[in-house]
């Protein structure tokens, strides 16, 4: 009688073990290859934005402003300073230069851009601002598949004031109070630090609407009332690089408040929620506002020490130096390991490590502070 051929149990287990080992060895390599492809796509997206910026400058002789406001509001006008939360973004003006001419033509720039619970009842441009633009999305961000998301933000330098005097920030994109200052923009000639040493756009993580303080794409607003939490007593102003002591003191206050913000319960855009976790950064590419389409170069990308996206400090209370409408740290960040991609004013895209020195990073964001930066410093 012939013996039947087959696998013994031991042989089967050995084969399974070998397959498991191979998978364990190959999976990280596959994941690394996928991330490399996503990072390359992200680099290409930023390259498109940098080229769009140059084409816009060629056509208009100046960079687009970071805030493009109108005082016309269909329906109910936003109350008081909330009118400034309806401004168009620089990205909106760059639409024709990123192959989005039809969308640009569909936008009614005579009306404010967006509807949010803060800004009243404007539905004029709903279709426009809800459109998903693939070149504005980093594929490594898990929220990039949603509509109207924005992963790439314009640089306002190391300015932390909401509306600097005269509307002038230290970066390429200008942020102004439309109730007091006319539209501001800068020319390439004003980039005296050199276009290769000046950041134009950087990556920013998108908030997840979870009020989760453990997610570094979320941020916070601190209350002006000292009883509401630990908040800084000063802010570095329009040039953080010149006041490092104020920067550290303010960042420590933000960190302290971040530890308590998760306990705050609120919903919607209420006063309570504005003094708690902010989870809507990057949610509208059309809105010209810090956190949505603008960032500053104070906290290095993907900081392990300051693990939040945004810290907005309200005026008054124990922060008398905070500017009207607040002052902010708005951090760049990504899901790429080790740092984030940045587009420079010369059209190049470079990867800045999360270990970059804070002063070096601040210098890269400013357009005319006179620093000398070597390429091996970041």
Model-derived features: where do they sit?
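Internal low-complexity, small-residue/proline-rich segments
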Residues: 32-378
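N-terminal single-pass transmembrane signal-anchor helix
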Residues: 2-38, 42, 48
